Amino acid sequence: MRLGVNVDHVATVRQARRTFEPSPVFAALIAQQAGADQITLHLREDRRHIQDRDLELIKELITIPVNLEMAPTEEMREIALRVKPDRITLVPERREEITTEGGLDVVSLKEKLKEYLKPIKEAGIEVSLFIEAQKEQIDASVEVGADAIEIHTGRYANLWNEHRFEEAKEELNRIKEAAIYAKEKGLKVYAGHGLTYHNVKDFVRELKGYVEELNIGHSIVANAVIFGFERAVKEMLNLIKT
């Protein structure tokens, strides 16, 4: 599996004091040097962590793919078309949430997304949709022209963290079924949300060969505070690639 390192929470620490450090751009460069396959960042509408300039600099300086997570708004589309990340991942956003709480409801947004995504696809940017492991959401993702889906792993992560291992295994089976179905429909399959150094091993063991890439941020940044960013990235890479 590939590893996309999400640098949002490096920016969270910086924005706590509205200062210039730590820099998510430097973190992205270190992650790249450590062997990360991709840099992921979420430019939220409220700019609570990543700022526009972070995105611009990361796209300019990083040589591995850049994955921009964003809400399906006109402002974000304009930014994506200007900066041209390698991939955009559409996610739902609510201002009161601490982090993204669930998948995008592609079924209800289907007609809007068909039109919304056209210029992005014409610009040669890969389109991924962050969704729940549900067949109806996968079918809708195909209909709107997505190239890929990213399956929301939050429920699995929460169950594992609460030591509800049997339920966590059932959730892994549900994710696996969704991944198989999505691949049959011609979609690339990624996954992420809530994955940590502790719960990722079971995920990789069960989903290797079905999921191509994991996007992980908070756990890596949390460990980087103690052990350093390069070591934190390398240790996660060791867990998902062996």
From Swiss-Prot:
A single BP term in Gene Ontology: pyridoxine biosynthetic process
Enzyme Commission number(s) from the entry: 2.6.99.2
Domain of life: Bacteria
Transmembrane intervals: none
GO molecular function: pyridoxine 5'-phosphate synthase activity
Location(s) in or outside the cell: Cytoplasm
Cysteine disulfide links: none
Catalytic residues in the record: H42 (proton acceptor), E69 (proton acceptor), H193 (proton donor)
Catalytic activity as recorded in UniProt: 3-amino-2-oxopropyl phosphate + 1-deoxy-D-xylulose 5-phosphate = pyridoxine 5'-phosphate + phosphate + 2 H2O + H(+)
Known function: Catalyzes the complicated ring closure reaction between the two acyclic compounds 1-deoxy-D-xylulose-5-phosphate (DXP) and 3-amino-2-oxopropyl phosphate (1-amino-acetone-3-phosphate or AAP) to form pyridoxine 5'-phosphate (PNP) and inorganic phosphate.
Identification of the protein by name: Pyridoxine 5'-phosphate synthase
Gene (UniProt): pdxJ
